[in-house]
A protein has these predicted regions:
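Small/aliphatic-rich secondary-structure junction motif
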Residues: 1-16, 113-170, 193-205, 261
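Short, ordered loop/turn segments at secondary-structure junctions
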Residues: 3, 75, 105-107, 151, ...
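Structural beta-alpha unit
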Residues: 8, 15-22, 26, 30, ...
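A short acidic, glycine-rich active-site loop
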Residues: 17-30, 169-183
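Active-site phosphate/pyrophosphate- and oxyanion-stabilizing loops and adjacent acidic/basic residues
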Residues: 37, 90, 131, 213, ...
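Intrinsically disordered or low-complexity boundary/linker segments at protein termini
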Residues: 42-46, 69, 90-141, 145, ...
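Internal alpha/beta domain cores that form substrate/cofactor-binding pockets in large enzymes
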Residues: 46-65, 81-83, 87, 95-98, ...
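Glycine-rich, Arg-bearing micro-motifs that act as flexible, cationic patches
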Residues: 72-91, 113, 225-251
């Protein structure tokens, strides 16, 4: 699907709606021609050219089409490369609950043994991401490897005073490590159990460091695709993506499947 920007009403009055529509169709056809349309058609892919506000139009078409998944690049023709995601990606994420696969420069290998990482923090959004994977198992290949990944802040050295009250005894490193393991277990358990119940092999991985960079670094080194919820604990829910999801999306080279929890 290709959506062309709307033209001013004065242009429509000057040239006529039919001429404008023809221009849109020709411009959209050029986009599809660059993709190799014959190869797409052989796979049952149909082409559609629309015009209007791009994010709004795509969201409305996804609703009409009853799309199960939206696939798009994270950046289009917008030259502001400093933005974490393209404006169209952000706008569409804000308007739809349909899961979105955001493609970066790194293309996943053509294999049925994808290395799939599910990022969780213990919130319902991580559980929703895992639920999507289990309900759409065929999308990832018969031999895919699944890893549930959780990030934890490093334990300070020397160990800081008791966080509840500085007048209480300082927590030992062993106590801090035990708490870190407990939080990790609580975060991954609700995701691990459904996979095991479905008879699927899954492992859990704890990465230590700033969540944004630690998760992205792990993904870039170990994963072919990332699945994550759009938000987690401590994020401003009115934002399109939570801060961690936004930064991971910006720093990760692999495709990211973002699940928008109902």
């Amino acid at each position: 699907m290709n959506v062309q920007y709307s033209v001013p009403e004065t242009i429509i009055h000057l040239f006529g709606m039919e001429a404008v529509k023809q221009y849109y169709l020709e411009a959209g056809k050029k986009v599809f021609d660059e993709l190799g349309p014959e190869a797409l058609r052989r796979r049952g892919v149909t082409e559609r050219v629309l015009y209007g506000d791009i994010g709004k139009t795509l969201a409305e078409e996804a609703e009409v089409f009853k799309a199960d998944l939206i696939v798009m690049g994270t950046r289009g023709l917008n030259p502001v490369k400093g933005l974490l995601l393209g404006s169209v990606s952000n706008d569409l994420l804000a308007r739809t609950k349909v899961p979105m696969l955001l493609l970066r420069d790194k293309t996943p290998p053509l294999t049925d043994k994808l290395r799939v990482g599910i990022f969780v923090d213990g919130s319902d959004y991580g559980a929703a991401a895992a639920d999507f994977v289990l309900r759409n198992r065929e999308l990832f290949g018969a031999k895919s490897e699944f890893t549930v990944v959780h990030a934890s802040a490093p334990i300070p050295d020397p160990v800081a005073p008791n966080p509840v009250s500085p007048h209480m005894p300082t927590l030992t490193r062993q106590e801090r490590e035990a708490e870190q393991r407990r939080v990790f277990a609580d975060a991954v358990k609700p995701v691990i159990e459904p996979f095991e119940a479905a008879g699927l092999a899954v492992k859990a991985e704890l990465v230590v460091g700033d969540a944004d960079h630690a998760l992205a670094d792990y993904a870039n080194k170990n994963l072919d695709i990332v699945v994550m919820g759009s938000h987690g604990y401590g994020n401003f829910k009115a934002a399109v993506l939570g801060s961690t999801a936004m930064h991971v999306a910006a720093l990760t080279e692999a495709p990211i499947l973002v699940i928008r929890k109902d």
